[in-house]
Amino acid sequence: MGLTRALASELGPDGIRVNAMAPGATVTEVPRESITEENLKAVVRETALRRVGTAQDIVGPVMFLVGPDSDWLTGQTLVADGGVTYA
């Protein structure tokens, strides 16, 4: 977060926006094979939405950050973690 803000301050005068994405636990085929069922259940319990994220859950926020709707944002870290941060 600090690096994102520092770079945004430094590069902003040149019209360069700097934002970051902070995804939570996201299961894809590769990690799914390496995580135990017990660990997966523990992650779900810690998530406000009571499920693990998927790659598709991350696509929307990323598309927002790279699209024109975020033209006024810089120095931000978008947390997409299903509510783990606040649960």
Where are these regions (language model features)?
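Conserved catalytic helix of short-chain dehydrogenase/reductases
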Residues: 1-10
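Alpha-helical segment proximal to the catalytic Tyr-Lys
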Residues: 9-13, 71
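Conserved SDR Rossmann-fold cofactor-binding beta-strand/turn motif
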Residues: 17-27, 66, 79-81
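A glycine/serine/threonine-rich, flexible loop-to-helix segment
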Residues: 13, 25-47
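Short C-terminal tail/terminal secondary-structure segment
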Residues: 62-63, 74-87
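Active-site loop of short-chain dehydrogenase/reductase
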Residues: 13-16, 76
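Short-chain dehydrogenase/reductase
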Residues: 4-5, 59-62, 66
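A conserved structural motif in NAD(P)-dependent oxidoreductases
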Residues: 47-58, 69
